[in-house]
Swiss-Prot record:
Transmembrane segments: 17-37, 106-126, 297-317, 425-445, 630-650
Annotated glycan sites: 135, 145, 188, 197, 231, 252, 272, 280, 490, 505, 512, 531, 573, 587
Keyword Glycoprotein tagged: yes
An individual GO BP term: plasma membrane fusion involved in cytogamy
Annotated function: Involved in cell fusion during mating by stabilizing the plasma membrane fusion event.
Protein name: Plasma membrane fusion protein PRM1
Species the sequence originates in: Saccharomyces cerevisiae (strain YJM789) (Baker's yeast)
Source organism superkingdom: Eukaryota
Length: 661
């Protein structure tokens, strides 16, 4: 036992070089690559089986996509053509109506320019003459009536005074006559003139009656004004134009475009003539066969290379162990030689006593091993595990009663099993078991989810979702397409109205502002010159006939152009397109509406069943693969457990050798 140590010696270390991390990693990579190859091979086989078993479904789906696409494109195209033609006819009719409006406006403007001007001037002359005559007679009547009344009053006053004087003279003459004659006979002249009353009362009743204006006002009332003349002319001219517009509005655009039933719609194909899968079955088999061969060759080559590297990695590891052991032994020898000078003291019996620099308990027989100290210092977990194992084996004994040799044996076995390489194997094994447990949990959850979701009895199952998702997806895509297309149409319409008709709007607004300014300036000038005179109304009427009425017509025309100079592009209604497709499907004479729906439903059911079986088959395959990985992890853990009997065998051999020595 004198040569037995509690730590691993060079031979012990070299016995574990095949457990180095490089070899183990390469071996694990080889196994993982092998499992991966098997997984790929199995997935390829599943894919091959699935494709070959669903050739009819694939052919049917491909046929529906390729053969029936013209049918639905034809329906949508015919609908768009119909709506486009209808909107074109409506736009043409609207254009004709605008042309009629413009023509009527031009005719009215021409009539107003030539005939209207003269008619307006004639009416204005009559109205102006009557107005001047009326104003003149009113002034004259007022002047005459006021003057005659004043003169009559003044004459009455003068005549009254003269009458009083004459009466006084008559009275005096009568008295003189009576004095001289004394005759009371009243037959003479003086008796006949009692008094004199001079008056002009009849002159008070002299006046010019106001009824003299009635004839003039009656003439003015009977004379038509320009507005009446203009309205009468416009009404006569608008008769044919209104008739044309009425006929245009009565036109039905839907009747003009003709019978849309003559538009051809490609029929729905009922057969699966486009057999993209069944017609290429031999090529599919050959392709999968080539894939399998390539996979096998690549797997063999890679595994061979990995094995060579794994074996080759042992040589540098062994060489490193030898060099490390030599350094450790050199360190120990150097320490043993140097301790005589640094760490010795002489007792009374001239025996050497070792000064332990790590403050360890005194070692019997005066032996101190620096490698043991190194292991205790730098491999603390090994030392702790060794202490736990010693306490477990010697349960119930105090540390002082434990045999040092037994303790050394336990520490050596623990050191052998907890070496860096052995712990690496243990860690890999435990990690592999943990990964396998996680994989089993995931597989169980996936199986439960697949079995629960891919059932036809579940109302929220994938099968029902697939049945309803087609229509929903078409409707959503149609709505999205119509919205995006309408956005494009809105942008285009705005750009056209701004870029093409923008200058028209700017011009019409500028012309209207100019016309309004001109009319305001003309009215201001007339008011400044003729306001308060008899010529103001006639001049205003003449200027209105000759200039302002034309300006108002131009302003009205510019406003009409401003309102009409805009492009309105019809929008796309996704709901109408969907209704047209549904109507076409209802009116179709081809018996594919119900049969296609039933076939599609059966096809979806078959696809769901195949999908469920395929997924479960793949999960079962990965379950088997996970079992294989768990087996490998358990084998790795067993390799670590094998280190215990190996350590016991080595320990027994050394003990026997020490006994023989």
């Amino acid at each position: 036992m004198s040569g037995f140590k509690c730590y691993l010696q060079l031979g012990d270390r070299l016995s574990q070089i095949w457990l180095n991390k490089y070899t183990l990693v390469l071996l694990l990579a080889m196994l993982k690559l092998l499992f991966f190859s098997k997984s790929i091979q199995h997935a390829i086989e599943v894919s091959e089986t699935y494709i070959l078993s669903n050739c009819y479904s694939i052919d049917s789906l491909y046929s529906k996509m390729t053969d029936n696409t013209p049918h639905y494109l034809g329906i949508m195209g015919n609908y768009l053509i119909e709506k486009g033609m209808e909107e074109t006819v409506k736009a043409t009719l609207e254009t004709l109506s605008l042309i009629v409006y413009a023509s009527e406006g031009l005719v009215n403007f021409a009539i107003d320019l030539y005939l209207g001007t003269y008619a307006c001037l004639i009416v204005s002359a009559v109205d102006g003459t009557v107005d001047v005559a009326t104003n003149t007679t009113e002034k004259l009547i007022s002047l005459v009536n006021d003057t005659v009344s004043s003169v009559a009053n003044e004459l009455d006053t003068g005549l009254n005074d003269i009458s009083k004087i004459i009466n006084k003279v008559i009275k005096a003459a009568s008295k003189v006559e009576n004095f001289f004659t004394g005759d009371d006979d009243d037959s003479n002249m003086t008796s006949s003139i009692k008094s004199v009353n001079l008056t002009i009362s009849a002159l008070h009743n002299l006046y010019i009656p106001s009824s003299i204006n009635d004839k003039l006002e009656e003439l003015s009332a009977k004379t038509p004004d320009f507005a009446q003349v203009k309205n009468t002319t416009k009404n006569l001219i608008s008769v044919p134009f209104n008739e044309v517009r009425k006929n245009i509005k009565a036109v039905n655009a839907s009747n003009i475009i003709g019978d849309t039933s003559v538009l051809y719609v490609p029929p729905v194909s009922l057969d699966n003539s486009t057999g993209i899968c069944s017609s290429n079955q031999s090529e599919i088999l050959a392709f999968y066969s080539i894939l399998g061969q390539v996979l096998k060759i690549a797997t063999v080559v890679c595994i061979t290379v990995l094995i060579c590297f794994a074996v080759g990695a042992m040589a540098p590891v062994a060489w490193n162990e030898i060099k490390l052991w030599r350094r450790l032994c050199g360190m120990r020898d150097h320490y043993m030689l140097s301790r005589q000078d640094s760490y010795t003291s002489f007792s009374s019996e001239n025996t050497h006593e070792l000064k332990d620099p790590f403050r360890d308990p005194p070692i019997q027989n005066g032996q101190y091993d620096v490698i043991a100290s190194y292991q205790q210092c730098f491999q603390t977990w090994n030392t702790r595990i060794a202490g736990w194992m010693t306490n477990l084996v010697t349960f119930g004994k105090s540390p002082e009663n434990i045999d040092p040799k037994t303790k050394q044996k336990i520490e050596w076995v623990v050191a052998y099993m907890t070496s860096e390489r052995a712990l690496c194997v243990l860690g890999i094994g435990l990690l592999g078991i943990l990964v396998c447990i996680c994989q089993f949990v995931m597989i169980a959850l996936l199986k439960h989810k697949i079995s629960h979701s891919l059932t036809s009895n579940d109302g929220d199952g994938v099968q029902n979702l697939l049945k309803s998702s087609t229509a929903v997806d078409i409707e959503n895509q149609m709505s999205l397409w119509s919205v995006q297309t309408n956005k494009y149409i809105n942008t285009t319409e705005t750009n056209i109205n701004q870029e093409v008709f923008g200058w028209i709007n700017t011009t019409t607004l500028s012309v209207n502002n100019t016309v309004a300014t001109m009319i305001s300036d003309i009215d201001t000038t007339l008011a400044d010159v003729f306001n308060g005179t008899l010529l103001y109304n006639p001049m205003k009427t003449v200027v209105g006939c000759a200039i302002e009425n034309k300006l108002y017509t131009i302003e009205k025309a510019m406003t009409w152009i401003h309102d009409k100079a805009q492009l309105h592009i019809p929008r796309i209604n996704g709901t109408q397109i969907k209704q047209a497709l549904a109507k076409q499907a209802d009116n179709s004479t081809i018996p594919t509406a119900s049969s296609t729906s039933a076939a599609t439903e059966n096809l979806l059911e078959n696809l769901v069943n195949d999908m469920r079986e395929g997924l479960l088959k793949i999960l079962r395959a990965y379950h088997r693969i996970t079992l294989g990985e768990l087996t490998v992890a358990l084998v790795i853990l067993a390799v670590w457990l094998v280190q215990l009997p190996i350590a016991l065998v080595i320990l027994r051999l050394r003990l026997r050798k020490a006994t023989f020595d």
